[in-house]
């Protein structure tokens, strides 16, 4: 099993545990009720479509290839520095096992900065898309090889 398969399998286990706490239907309802100004007027899409280069800067504590990157992970400080430097969007790692990410990183960063945030995780279930919205994400990373569908589909709008 390659690393991507391992990440996906661990993600499936995490989702199964999360669903024991909050069902898919409940998570959908929470996501629908969650207000996120950064989703209004397609803020994420707009920053990517603007003239010139768009910058998506990443907050990452560790990785499988590098190990621990930032022992003293001052993620809020890093996010503010990215925004002040002109980032258009911030990508936040939430995968806990290999990247040492936390959902709280995304939640707190999204509350702190005025630019859109992406949840960077190994999305294997629609549950994670709704969950991402409740955490403040304006977008999620999708790796099609991890999703068991014949072609990409778009979930119902939840903004």
Regions found by a protein language model. Give the residues of each.
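Hydrophobic faces of well-ordered beta-strands that scaffold small-molecule active sites
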Residues: 55-57, 90-92, 117-120, 140-142
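Conserved residues at the C-terminal ends of beta-strands
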Residues: 10, 93, 143, 156
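Glycine-rich beta-to-alpha transition loops that act as phosphate-gripper elements at the mouths
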Residues: 58-62, 69-73, 96-100, 117-129, ...
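An N-cap/entry alpha-helix motif that binds or orients negatively charged groups
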Residues: 2-70
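Generic structural signal for well-ordered alpha-helices
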Residues: 45, 79, 103-106, 129
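Alpha-helix-loop-beta-strand connector modules within alpha/beta enzyme cores
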Residues: 101-118, 150
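Single conserved hydrophobic/aromatic residue that forms the stacking wall/gate
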Residues: 148-159
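Alpha/beta enzyme core
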Residues: 71-90, 112, 129-138
